[in-house]
């Protein structure tokens, strides 16, 4: 099962999405033992996102474990006022490579599967994205999160370089700003 509809948690005002549920088996002396693995993403639609991978004998337990792990592994993403990326970014995790670039207002989220779920819960509305290599949902999620972690806002760049924000904005292009 891949990419189910969103569920909203009223406890923390977080948006939760289930990406995949896999049935896995372990062969033992008496036959096979089945268990389930769930991959989920959680975000506040305002620049915070986390993902979790949970395993259990029953599907609801696996999903619950994944959601708990996702809530504990949340990171902050610097968003543009136009709800898009600050700049083009590349994310790599094992065999999965993803490329994301900012899009103009009204474009929407042009991305597939697991990447789309992350971008929706983080609060990005306009982005163009492409996955290369491995399309394994776990690798795509990790590559996307790695890319989002490495994104820098103009304020962060100015502070790191010891320059003024005006200097950075005038001499470098940050999504048309």
Curated annotation (Swiss-Prot):
Segment forming the signal sequence: none
Domain S5 DRBM: 14-77
SUPFAM superfamilies for this protein: dsRNA-binding domain-like, Ribosomal protein S5 domain 2-like
Gene Ontology biological-process entries: translation
Keyword Cell inner membrane included in the entry's annotation: no
One Pfam family, short name: Ribosomal_S5
Disulfide bridge map: none
Keywords: Ribonucleoprotein, Ribosomal protein, RNA-binding, rRNA-binding
Keyword Ribonucleoprotein included in the entry's annotation: yes
GO molecular function terms listed in the Swiss-Prot or TrEMBL record: rRNA binding; structural constituent of ribosome
InterPro entries given in the database record: Ribosomal_Su5_D2-typ_SF, Ribosomal_uS5, Ribosomal_uS5_bac-type, Ribosomal_uS5_C, Ribosomal_uS5_N, Ribosomal_uS5_N_CS, Ribsml_uS5_D2-typ_fold_subgr
Assigned protein family: Belongs to the universal ribosomal protein uS5 family.
Domain notes per entry: The N-terminal domain interacts with the head of the 30S subunit; the C-terminal domain interacts with the body and contacts protein S4. The interaction surface between S4 and S5 is involved in control of translational fidelity.
Purpose: With S4 and S12 plays an important role in translational accuracy. Located at the back of the 30S subunit body where it stabilizes the conformation of the head with respect to the body.
Subunit field text: Part of the 30S ribosomal subunit. Contacts proteins S4 and S8.
Name of the protein: Small ribosomal subunit protein uS5
Source lineage: Bacteria, Pseudomonadati, Pseudomonadota, Gammaproteobacteria, Enterobacterales
